[in-house]
Amino acid sequence: MATTINTSNKNTVKLLDILKIIFENNKTNTISEETLLSLYYIFDQTIFASLELIDKELITKYVFQPSNRYFYVVEGRKGAKYMCLIQGDYCSCPSFNFSVLLKSDSVYCKHQISSILAEIISNVKVIEFDDSEYQSQILSIESLSFKTPTHKFQQK
């Protein structure tokens, strides 16, 4: 009897679980060719954009003490910053909203993938804050999530 996997609910497979399995035996904090092929098979072209963010060291983990709450901040183009909640399956980038939530073209955006990959290979900057700064940091990052080029529309 064949086993059927339910793929209708994308939340059944979590990004963190996928990457932990792929890197389970990786003790070198590097990405081997075999691992890269596995990542490409799962995430397609998005993996290359994610790796570029890691190479440019654009991922920072904000950790709040004493609660140990955290989220990732990924720097984007033109001063934009995006907040990623890996456990909460959220990113404040436009691609997450459009491609992941609305169109369902992707399961994860490049910022989510790069955040957890950077953590796994120990290539993430960490900044610690007091818990009292949690809300203000979120508001600060969210305000920078919408720094997109303005478009001027011509009236006819």
From Swiss-Prot:
Compartment(s): Nucleus
Disulfide feature: none
Stored PROSITE patterns: ZF_SWIM
GO biological process, one term: double-strand break repair via homologous recombination
GO MF annotation terms: zinc ion binding
Zinc finger intervals, SWIM-type: 82-120
Keywords: DNA damage, DNA recombination, DNA repair, Metal-binding, Nucleus, Zinc, Zinc-finger
Cellular component aspect of the GO annotation: nucleus; Shu complex
InterPro entries: Znf_SWIM
Family: Belongs to the SWS1 family.
PANTHER family: ZINC FINGER SWIM DOMAIN-CONTAINING PROTEIN 7
Function: May be involved in the homologous recombination repair (HRR) pathway of double-stranded DNA breaks arising during DNA replication or induced by DNA-damaging agents.
Protein name, UniProt field: Zinc finger SWIM domain-containing protein 7 homolog
Organismal lineage: Eukaryota, Amoebozoa, Evosea, Eumycetozoa, Dictyostelia
